[in-house]
């Protein structure tokens, strides 16, 4: 339960070592075994791995195909990140969106590095055989990236209709360019 509170409230791992928190735990139970920040970190990581495994199993069990959005994002700090989100319809016909990966992606973004990262994400989640389409920003490097991924997946016959529906351009990005 403590690991869930740390995640939910974005608390540091050493929260469990705060003197006031330790006193509260001791007050509630004199026999409590106090844990360290390393134990707290290990517990959070264990919970993450369990949740990730649950999501993997869920993605494997859904009857529908999975659509992806991929975003390369640069906040004001000039750090760069890559975000891969899965979208699917569950067995109750509810649209579900799950961020699968969000990680640091230092510049530059050469095509080979980006492709390797994306293909590793797909393999890691075990969804290569379930893809329907991917939405990317309109950029020439994204077109090249999408073409290569489509070619790679089509070699194994993994895409519907030979992948003609595989690349969907980002409508919001296009509208923003028009405005």
Model features per residue range: what roles?
Residues 1-179:
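Short alpha-helical patches at protein termini and domain edges
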């Amino acid at each position: 339960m403590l690991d869930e509170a740390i995640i939910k409230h974005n608390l540091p791992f050493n929260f469990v070592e705060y003197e006031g928190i330790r006193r509260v735990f001791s007050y509630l139970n004199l026999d409590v075994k106090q844990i360290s920040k390393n134990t707290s970190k290990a517990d959070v990581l264990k919970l993450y791995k369990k949740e990730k495994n649950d999501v993997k199993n869920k993605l494997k069990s859904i009857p529908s195909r999975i659509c992806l959005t991929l975003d390369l994002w640069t906040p004001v700090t000039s750090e760069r990140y890559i975000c891969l989100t899965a979208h699917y319809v569950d067995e109750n016909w509810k649209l579900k969106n799950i961020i699968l990966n969000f990680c640091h992606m230092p510049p530059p973004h050469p095509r080979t590095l980006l492709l390797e990262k994306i293909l590793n994400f797909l393999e890691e989640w075990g969804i290569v055989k379930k893809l329907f389409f991917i939405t990317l920003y309109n950029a020439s490097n994204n077109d090249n990236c999408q073409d290569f991924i489509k070619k790679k997946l089509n070699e194994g016959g993994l895409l519907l209709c030979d992948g003609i529906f595989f690349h969907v351009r980002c409508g919001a990005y296009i509208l923003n360019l028009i405005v």
